[in-house]
Curated annotation (Swiss-Prot):
Annotated family: Belongs to the bacterial ribosomal protein bS6 family.
Species the sequence originates in: Synechococcus sp. (strain CC9902)
InterPro entries: Ribosomal_bS6, Ribosomal_bS6_CS, Ribosomal_bS6_sf, Ribosomal_S6_plastid/chlpt, Transl_elong_EF1B/ribsomal_bS6
PROSITE patterns referenced in this protein's UniProt entry, alphabetically: RIBOSOMAL_S6 (PS01048)
Keywords tagged on the record: Ribonucleoprotein, Ribosomal protein, RNA-binding, rRNA-binding
Name by which UniProt lists this protein: Small ribosomal subunit protein bS6
Stated role: Binds together with bS18 to 16S ribosomal RNA.
Length: 126
């Protein structure tokens, strides 16, 4: 079993932004990771939760967790974009050591294609 390093980024979005905008932020940050040459391993929407203490006058936030691996250059690009964004009220990236998390189907992406044999039509009988 190989112990590869990977990164987990947890970020908190403002609670007052609409659902469509939340999805656009999730897609934007996921695409940034891919454009930086890294791979998105997992993307989990944790939902709206109460904060332990107020951040920027907000008592709640929308939590999103993003697991990715790469050479580490993607972290700088991602955190710079989050720092500039007014919709991200807090973020943290942690480098993890250990087995890579099992890949899941990321919302907004296509599921793996079924077996080719299942899609092949049967020849018609004459």
């Amino acid at each position: 079993m190989t112990l590869d390093p990977y990164y987990e980024t947890m970020y908190i979005l403002r609670p007052d932004i609409p659902e469509e905008e939340v999805e656009s932020h999730v897609t934007k940050y996921r695409d940034m990771i891919v454009e930086a040459g890294a791979e998105v391993l997992d993307n989990q929407m944790r939902g709206k939760r109460r904060l332990a203490y107020p951040i920027a006058k907000h008592k709640e936030g929308i939590y999103v967790q993003l697991s990715h691996n790469g050479d580490g250059q993607q972290v700088e690009v991602l955190e710079k974009a989050m720092r500039i964004s007014e919709d991200v009220i807090r973020y943290l990236t942690v480098k993890q050591e250990g087995p890579l998390p099992a890949p899941r189907v990321v919302p907004g992406t296509e599921a793996p294609e079924p077996a080719q044999a299942a899609e092949t039509p049967e020849p018609e009988a004459s």
